[in-house]
């Protein structure tokens, strides 16, 4: 509530500071691509929305509108250059309504794949799939195997760890969530399809078709107390080992009230 009351400017979250030029490396009224990082982590860990969902969507749309560039030909960056020329990317920050500090935070004009994945993941969780795909397609066009290796997303060095934020895209698209204390494996995909999943002791593939789920275990042992698909519990009474598949799991019928 305090974050909303103090930092919300009607479109996105900002930094409140008396004089943005009194200290180096601030951003003030700028649109920060990282402004929903806490929401990103909350979603990955099954905590849902920690700020108002409508404000999440508004802030995400502001990030895409103001920070995404389809072509960086006219963009100036005096720091590291991870995207250039007619390539596109998501800037770490922008000041569409002015107010750029005299010395903004370092790297503000750069493009980081890890932040692009993080923003795209949060967009998926917020139901903004088209915007998420825009960010990811722009990124993938830079790493298409022509100028850069698709297996090495470079930031401050080769194979930089922040790009592992891309795993969040899988979790957001599949709605996969493993609750270890409750031993519950849940799926809430944005659409039907096949998805990878992991638990503490198993990994494999999940196939979702409507209210039907089939699990294929590729490694380890899946020993869950409960399987949930789109909020409804599915029957799975026995553990599954590597090489095994479940039957097609369906929720029990909802009891009909007798007239």
Which sequence ranges carry the predicted segments?
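Short, conserved secondary-structure transition motifs
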Residues: 1-6, 162-164
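Extended glycan-interaction surfaces of carbohydrate-active proteins
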Residues: 4-112, 140, 144-146
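Non-catalytic C-terminal accessory modules of carbohydrate-active enzymes
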Residues: 83-86, 102-105, 109-110, 116-245, ...
């Amino acid at each position: 509530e305090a974050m909303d009351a103090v930092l919300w400017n009607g479109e996105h979250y900002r930094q409140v500071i008396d004089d943005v030029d009194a200290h180096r490396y601030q951003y003030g009224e700028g649109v920060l691509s990282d402004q929903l990082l806490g929401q990103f982590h909350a979603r990955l860990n099954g905590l849902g929305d920690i700020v108002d969902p409508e404000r999440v969507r508004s802030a995400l749309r502001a990030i895409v509108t103001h920070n995404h560039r389809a072509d960086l030909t006219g963009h100036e960056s005096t720091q590291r250059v991870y995207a250039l020329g007619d390539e596109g990317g998501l800037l770490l920050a922008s000041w569409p309504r002015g107010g750029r500090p005299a010395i903004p935070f370092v790297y503000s004009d750069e493009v980081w794949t890890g932040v692009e994945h993080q923003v795209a993941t949060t967009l998926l969780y917020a139901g903004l799939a088209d915007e998420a795909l825009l960010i990811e397609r722009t990124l993938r066009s830079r790493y298409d195997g022509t100028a850069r290796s698709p297996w090495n997303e470079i930031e401050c060095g080769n194979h930089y760890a922040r790009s592992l934020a891309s795993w969040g895209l899988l979790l957001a698209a599949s709605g996969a969530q493993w609750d270890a204390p409750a031993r519950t494996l849940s799926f809430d995909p944005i659409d039907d399809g096949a998805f990878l999943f992991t638990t503490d002791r198993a990994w494999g593939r999940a196939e979702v078709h409507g209210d039907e789920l089939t699990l294929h275990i590729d490694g380890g042992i899946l020993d869950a107390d409960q399987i949930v698909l789109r909020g409804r519990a599915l029957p799975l009474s026995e553990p599954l080992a590597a090489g095994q598949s479940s039957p097609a799991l369906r929720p029990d019928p909802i009891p009909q009230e007798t007239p």
